Amino acid sequence: MGTNGGVIAEQSMEIETNENPDKVEEPVVRRKRVTRRRHRRIHSKNNCLTPPNSDDDPQMSTPDDPVIHSPPSIGAAPGMNGYHGSGVKLEESSGACGSPDDGLLDSSEESRRRQKTCRVCGDHATGYNFNVITCESCKAFFRRNALRPKEFKCPYSEDCEINSVSRRFCQKCRLRKCFTVGMKKEWILNEEQLRRRKNSRLNNTGTCNKRSQPGNQQSPQGPNQQPHLSPHHPGVAIYPPQPQRPLTINPMDNQMMHHMQANRPNAMPQLISPPGAQPYPLTSPVGSSASDSPPNRSLTMMHNGEKSPDGYDPNIMAHRAPPPSFNNRPKMDSGQVVLSTEEYKQLLSRIPGAQVPGLMNEEEPINKRAAYNCNGHPMPAETTPPYSAPMSDMSLSRHNSTSSGTEKNHMTHSTVSAIPGNSAQNHFDIASFGMGIVTATGGGDAAEEMYKRMNMFYENCIQSALDSPENQEPKPQEAMIPKEEYMTPTHGFQYQSDPYQVPPAERNINYQLNAAELKALDAVREAFYGMDDPMEQGRQMQSFLKANKTPADIMNIMDVTMRRFVKVAKGVPAFREVSQEGKFSLLKGGMIEMLTVRGVTRYDASTNSFKTPTIKGQNVSVNVDDMFAKLNANAQAQKAKCLEFFGFFDEEIKKNELAVYLVMLAVLFSVRSDPPMNENDVRIVTERHNHFMSLLNRYLESLFGEQARRIFERIPKALGLLNEIARNAGMLFMGTVRSGEAEELPGEFFKIK
């Protein structure tokens, strides 16, 4: 019967296919789907023990998954599965235990889902990096170079095609494309942020590992339920764990609280395990067994969990140590004794953040090495034992003798030293205090008296060590504080009314540029973009290519640079705020000065010539001696001043075009008197001049650190010489160029007749 039914079904499919040619592929597709689903149903029954409701479980995903999720396919949409909704559940539930053929289908679908291309180079993308889908190579390239002040140069046509092969050949075009597609350099983390993220991930990983251990499986407890108590020793008092308090540099508060708890009757010390998660019941060390104790770790008495990672109390071994030997020490009139140099170094080494000096004078720090003595007894000369704990982990050690859990705690008497003038019954050992072995005797108000004396010791000895110059902690770095507004009094680099009065450089300053300063530098680069674009035609190009250049050719070459300076000025937002008369005054007074500053980057001292990349594929140079020799009689004095001006700039500045751009903008935005500028223009120009000078100072600091002060202090003298050069340059071409031989724009600045 089943066989006949199958034959009839096949015949009906053939008839339907012959009648409807458009549905030729549909029976084949349905037959494949039915076969695949039958195979999956049989395979899941034989090999999988999946609960019936497991099909509804959502797929797990993590935020660190680098896969770029694409929209669901059409086949997975409701109503497009061919049959009923149960078919969809069969496909979903077969992901974990499907056949090899199903794995191939799933892997092919997964590979199609993963096929995303990098927006920069077109390579295989791994995820969203800095706001754009990119590959790992472009992600690393952008992180390394987006915040660098270094200016890349394109070795080709400034318009390179970036793909997976050519991306290595041109860094400038690759970085420009990164910004073009929308990558944001503000999303790059600095070293401090990377360190915090790494620590956070390590903490999360450690927490997950502890929770995943078999011993950590505990039954859930309500908020008001008490932790599990061992039935072996019901008389042992177990206290719930307390939240850890932040560590402070003064340990007296922790000492006082712990000592006050020690004087309470019927109180047992809290027994806890080392810091971290506590997956084991808290019981007495005597009655705990292997099943309820952590492996290879013994329960110890620790105050608030502030102990060494090894999980032992250093003071336990201190009680077994032999009594310390005493040596004679030099005494002071105030009843103090002087610590030895080695002991003083050890004391400083226990202060968080303190630096032990390598060489120490025996007489200079005598007031710091002085400590109180008890009735003339000298201080112990023992060095720090191997079991001593750091000063930040000091705790009061006690010997408790309890028979039934109801007797009071009896504290053993130990050798101690007291401040002169106080009773010898209530005292503490200063030397032991420095080694983390503080013991106390007495009761009642003894704790308060001891607390006062400990504070006095802290003020007299430890605080003086902290206040010493070699132990001062560095001040907060202002440059690392994020700022919201640019050019405000709270900004990273200060807006100075007189930028030439540079304050003395402070030590331990982070000279890294912040986001606002980097944005301002990007605006400067954008304004000068295209300054070195190659020429292709025109009379100026013929002047560039001549081997023997005339004064008219020199003016035509300067015409190209002058026109590009005008384009740069129009690209500066502050220049557009100036009135039309003010713009003319700025360009007329600053054009020759900007040409001279431009010569700083083009002058080659080895060949004594100016070199320019304006002509593509041509090495164009103009010899300085030949150029000034063809001008009038005043040219030689002008040449000497120009060479002197070039000498004010270091070689690092001459090679850094961005620094020279900032100098050129500061020269452009200078108050001019021909023609006179109105009051509003003077205000705008003055603010912009100070702005670019302050930005230049910060940029130099980011490159040279403390050496930037020496470089920046030479700029005012260089600008003074620049003004003198510009005043005497107008007559250089007088009588050497005929009318019509040169372009008109240079004739506005240089007189030819």
Curated annotation (Swiss-Prot):
Q: What is the effect of changing R196A?
A: Defective nuclear localization
In the UniProt annotation, what is the result of changing R197K? In m424; reduced DNA binding affinity and transcriptional activity in vitro. Defective dauer formation
Reported effect of changing A125V? In m420; no transcriptional activity in vitro. Defective dauer formation
| Record field: compositional bias (Polar residues) | 201-211, 285-301, 394-410
Q: Name one GO cellular component term.
A: nucleus
Q: Which PANTHER family match?
A: NUCLEAR HORMONE RECEPTOR (PTHR24082), NUCLEAR HORMONE RECEPTOR FAMILY MEMBER DAF-12 (PTHR24082:SF494)
What is the official name of this protein in its record?
Nuclear hormone receptor family member daf-12
- The species is Caenorhabditis elegans
- Lineage of this protein's species? Eukaryota, Metazoa, Ecdysozoa, Nematoda, Chromadorea
